[in-house]
């Protein structure tokens, strides 16, 4: 009798173990949350995406999330993955460092901040930065009065690397160079898909600026009045 009882208990435990094992496999198939699974470029649309996240093999990330028509949250820095959460340490704004829960469905959809994102490609080539190293003039005006010009004022963005830039406002006086002046403001930015997201070092929100280097006003967005607005 005892032998029969022990056999029944052993059989029950074996069946329970198999069931738990199958549940673990099914759970793993339904949702992936490891580092290897998140390494990619993700967008909410194939064309004209409004929400973009990118995680690279080297541990760096870029995030662009639309908050309103003229306000996008953006962040760059380093990340780590642990138990279904990706911890993002922002390069510039401490308050923008955050831990995000995420999951990847069996159909390959990334669930991030309540947004469904599609895998577009690998990060290394997806966010090619055409602005790195440029000192780009994007606006300006002449100074003077009726019938004469005393100088000019110019707006530049000096892109020092992939993440950091300086917004520069300079005044040049043709006949009085001692009055020349230049003001620099430290900025951080993300360039993606011919658009620029640019903010001062302690801010993380930006309009979505169009980038057209063939135009004199090459960084701009169109407001609700149909007007071009420069940085």
Task: Map each language-model feature to its residues.
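Lipid interaction determinants
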Residues: 21-74, 85-186, 192-231
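Sec-dependent signal peptide recognition
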Residues: 2-9
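C-terminal motif of bacterial Sec signal peptides marking the signal peptidase cleavage site
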Residues: 14-17
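Short beta-strand-centered aromatic/proline hotspots
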Residues: 77-79
């Amino acid at each position: 009798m005892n032998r029969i009882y022990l056999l029944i208990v052993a059989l029950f435990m074996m069946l329970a173990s198999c069931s738990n094992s199958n549940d673990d496999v099914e759970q793993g198939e339904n949702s992936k949350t490891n580092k290897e699974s998140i390494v990619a470029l993700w967008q909410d649309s194939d064309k004209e995406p409004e929400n973009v996240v990118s995680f690279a093999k080297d541990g760096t990330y870029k995030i662009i999330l639309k908050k309103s028509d003229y306000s996008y949250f953006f962040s760059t820095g380093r990340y780590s993955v642990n138990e279904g959460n990706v911890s993002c340490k922002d390069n510039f704004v401490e308050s923008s460092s955050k831990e995000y829960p995420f999951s990847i469905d069996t159909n390959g959809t990334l669930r991030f901040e309540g947004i469904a994102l599609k895998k577009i490609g690998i990060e290394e080539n997806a966010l090619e930065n055409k602005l790195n190293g440029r000192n780009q003039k994007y606006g300006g005006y002449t100074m003077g009065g009726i019938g004469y010009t005393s100088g000019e004022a110019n707006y530049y963005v000096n892109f020092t690397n992939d993440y950091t830039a300086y917004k520069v406002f300079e005044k040049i006086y043709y006949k009085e160079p001692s009055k020349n002046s230049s003001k620099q403001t430290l900025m951080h930015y993300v360039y993606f898909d011919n658009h620029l997201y640019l903010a001062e070092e302690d801010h993380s929100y930006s309009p979505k600026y169009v980038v057209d280097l063939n135009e004199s006003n090459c960084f701009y967005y169109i407001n609700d009045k149909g007007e071009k607005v420069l940085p």
